[in-house]
C-alpha cells in the first residue's frame, strides 16, 4: 500500500527544489502543483510551459503520473523538467499518494 509520509520525503528530496504544492503557492522553476489531479498538462495558471507540455493533452491522474514520473522526458519529449525520473514503482506510488493529499483540499 502506498505511503504518503514516505512520498512526502521523496517530494522534499527530489521535487521541492522546483515545485510547491500548497494552494496559492508560487511557481518556482516548475509549476505549483495545487489542483494537479484532473488538470490537463500545461495548464497551471501563470506558468510558462513548453509547447510539448501544452500539447500533450492528457489529464493528470494516478496512471498518467505513474508513467510520467518514471521517465518524464520519454513521456513528454520536449518538457523542460530536468528530473530523470523515479525508476522504483513503490517510490512513484508513495509520491503520488502524497501528491493526492497535498495538492487538494
From Swiss-Prot:
Localization: Mitochondrion intermembrane space
GO BP terms, alphabetized: apoptotic process; hydrogen peroxide metabolic process; mitochondrial electron transport, cytochrome c to oxygen; mitochondrial electron transport, ubiquinol to cytochrome c; positive regulation of intrinsic apoptotic signaling pathway
GO terms, molecular function: electron transfer activity; heme binding; metal ion binding
Residues reported to bind heme c: 15, 18-19, 81
PTMs per UniProt: Binds 1 heme c group covalently per subunit. Phosphorylation at Tyr-49 and Tyr-98 both reduce by half the turnover in the reaction with cytochrome c oxidase, down-regulating mitochondrial respiration.
GO cellular component: mitochondrial intermembrane space
Keyword DNA-binding found: no
Domain of life assignment: Eukaryota
Keywords, comma-separated and alphabetical: Apoptosis, Electron transport, Heme, Iron, Metal-binding, Mitochondrion, Phosphoprotein, Respiratory chain, Transport
Assigned protein family: Belongs to the cytochrome c family.
PANTHER family: CYTOCHROME C
Role according to the record: Electron carrier protein. The oxidized form of the cytochrome c heme group can accept an electron from the heme group of the cytochrome c1 subunit of cytochrome reductase. Cytochrome c then transfers this electron to the cytochrome oxidase complex, the final protein carrier in the mitochondrial electron-transport chain.
Designated name of the protein: Cytochrome c 2
Amino acid at each position: 500500500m502506498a505511503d504518503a509520509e514516505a512520498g512526502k520525503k521523496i517530494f522534499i528530496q527530489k521535487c521541492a527544489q522546483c515545485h510547491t504544492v500548497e494552494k496559492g503557492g508560487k511557481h518556482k522553476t516548475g509549476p505549483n502543483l495545487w489542483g494537479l489531479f484532473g488538470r490537463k498538462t500545461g495548464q497551471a495558471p501563470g506558468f510558462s510551459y513548453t509547447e510539448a507540455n501544452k500539447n500533450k493533452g492528457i489529464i493528470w491522474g494516478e496512471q498518467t503520473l505513474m508513467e510520467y514520473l518514471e521517465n518524464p522526458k520519454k513521456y513528454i519529449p520536449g518538457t523542460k523538467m530536468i528530473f530523470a525520473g523515479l525508476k522504483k514503482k513503490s517510490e512513484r506510488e508513495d509520491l503520488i499518494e502524497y501528491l493526492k493529499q497535498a495538492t487538494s483540499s
